[in-house]
Every structure is written in structure tokens, then in C-alpha cells.
């Protein structure tokens, strides 16, 4: 993906510097438009040319002009997720987000940064640190997408730390949240989260056939490289358990090649070494 390439082979400082440069340019453009709007309105009111209808019309025009710029700013922020999702580099991702805390000081932005940082820490294998960041964020009023992200982070971290009781508590929280959704689109998103949790628990219990069936059905829809890498590592685990060593080796080699700094790569190297030993033995 071309957009993800812009973050490759760059230090966190370079990425944030470029991000700030683009952000300041867009913010400057908004300020310029606002000043122009104020000057035109003052002139119109002062000379008595503008009535209330004219003022409201100009306000609507202002909103229409600045809205795409605000969307552009939001897109720039969201595009940083490509460092994690496409470049599979949670280490750089976390460092970038730490630097961004000094750029975005508004509460809403700070909470979004911390949730994303917790995800980066999780994919770096720093599960206790991710939980330390994620748990306090539950007290905030979050968008549905961020609520789902937070539930996913907490569930995965507790499961990886083998705290099944807390993982199941998080799953119950997810079920309660999903049951409250009215919109069909939110219900689908919520159900997908529950399916991911069910599949993960099936793998954890050693129910390999159930996991394979669920994961193969989902993996056809994966677009992010991170999803593909994590999927093939889990499927390799299933392949090994089922004696399908050739498939397992193919999956593991792909994960090592594409997995970047994801914590699963370390597990993958260990699994591949054990598999090679089996073949030689």
C-alpha cells in the first residue's frame, strides 16, 4: 500500500515532524478562513448590508468549507495506524504515539492516542503495560469503535497472560455492549468481535478444528497485513497440532518475512526452529 510506504525506513521523530508540518499547514488554513469570515461579517454588519439570513448563510458556507479540512486532519491521524496495521511495526508505532501526546493536548485526542498506544504495546508483547494504559480509559465516554478496540485489547492481554477469569469477564462486557446495539452495522461489528473472542478461546482450549473453521471463514476478508500475519501464525499452530507440517512451515515463513516487530514473530521463529528439528529428526 502506497500510503503505508511513507512511514517505512523513518524514525519516529521524522514521522512526527512531517505529521506536525502537515497539521500546522491545515490548521493555518482554517485560521485564515475564519479570519476572512470574521472580516467579511464585520464589514457586512457595519455597513448594514447583511441581515440575519446573510449571516447564517455565510456561517453555513464557513462550515461547508472547513469541514473537509477537519476530515483531512482526522485522516492524517488515522493514517498513522498504517504503521501498525500494514507495516507491522508496533515498536515505532508506540514511539510515534508517545511523541504525539505533546502535539495533541485536547482530552478527546489524548484518550484516542492512549487507546492506540495500548494496542501498540499489546502487539509489542508488553501485555501488562498495555493493560496499565487501557484499564483506566474505561471511565471515559468513548465512541463505539474505541469501546470495541479497548475490549479487544483487554481480552487479548488477559488471555496472553493466562488470566482466563478476567478474559471471560471482558468477553461478558463485550456481550452486554453488543446486545445494546440497535443499528445493524454496529451489531455486525460487535458480533465480529465476539466471533474473534470465541475463536481465540477455541484455540486456547486446543479445539483446533473449530478454530480453523472460524478463522478460515474470516481470513478471506482480511485486508491489513497485521491480520494476515497473526492469522497464519495461529493457523500454523493448528497445522502442527494436526500434523500438517508442510502447511505450517509455509505459514511460519510468511509470518517471519512480513511480521516486522510484532511479538508473534518471536513465537514464530521458535515454532519454525522446533519444526525444522522435527523434520531433521
Labelled PLM ranges:
Residues 26-44:
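Canonical alpha-helical transmembrane segments of integral membrane proteins
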Residues 207, 211-281:
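Long, non-transmembrane cytosolic or organellar matrix-exposed soluble domains/tails
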Amino acid at each position: 500500500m502506497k500510503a503505508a510506504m511513507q512511514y517505512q525506513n523513518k524514525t519516529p521523530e521524522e514521522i512526527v515532524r512531517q505529521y506536525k508540518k502537515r497539521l500546522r499547514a491545515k490548521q493555518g488554513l482554517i485560521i485564515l478562513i475564519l479570519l476572512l469570515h470574521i472580516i467579511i461579517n464585520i464589514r457586512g454588519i457595519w455597513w448594514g448590508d447583511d441581515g440575519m439570513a446573510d449571516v447564517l448563510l455565510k456561517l453555513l458556507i464557513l462550515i461547508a468549507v472547513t469541514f473537509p479540512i477537519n476530515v483531512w486532519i482526522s485522516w492524517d491521524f488515522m493514517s498513522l495506524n498504517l504503521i501498525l496495521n500494514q507495516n507491522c511495526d508496533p515498536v515505532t508505532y508506540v514511539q510515534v504515539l508517545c511523541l504525539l501526546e505533546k502535539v495533541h493536548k485536547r482530552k478527546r485526542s489524548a484518550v484516542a492516542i492512549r487507546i492506540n498506544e495500548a494496542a501498540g504495546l499489546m502487539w509489542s508483547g508488553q501485555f501488562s503495560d498495555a493493560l496499565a494504559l487501557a484499564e483506566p480509559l474505561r471511565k471515559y465516554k468513548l465512541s463505539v469503535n474505541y469501546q470495541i478496540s479497548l475490549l479487544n485489547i483487554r481480552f487479548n492481554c488477559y488471555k496472553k497472560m493466562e488470566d482466563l477469569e478476567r478474559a471471560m469477564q471482558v468477553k461478558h462486557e463485550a456481550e452486554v455492549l453488543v446486545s445494546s446495539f440497535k443499528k445493524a452495522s454496529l451489531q455486525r461489528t460487535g458480533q465480529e468481535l465476539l466471533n474473534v473472542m470465541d475463536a481465540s478461546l477455541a484455540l486456547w482450549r486446543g479445539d483446533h478444528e473449530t478454530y480453523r473453521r472460524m478463522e478460515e471463514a474470516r481470513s478471506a476478508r482480511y485486508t491489513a497485513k497485521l491480520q494476515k500475519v497473526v492469522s497464519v501464525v495461529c493457523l500454523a499452530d493448528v497445522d502442527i497440532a494436526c500434523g500438517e507440517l508442510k502447511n505450517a512451515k509455509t505459514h511460519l515463513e510468511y509470518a517471519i518475512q512480513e511480521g516486522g516487530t510484532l511479538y508473534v514473530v518471536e513465537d514464530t521463529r521458535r515454532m519454525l526452529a522446533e519444526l525444522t528439528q522435527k523434520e531433521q529428526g
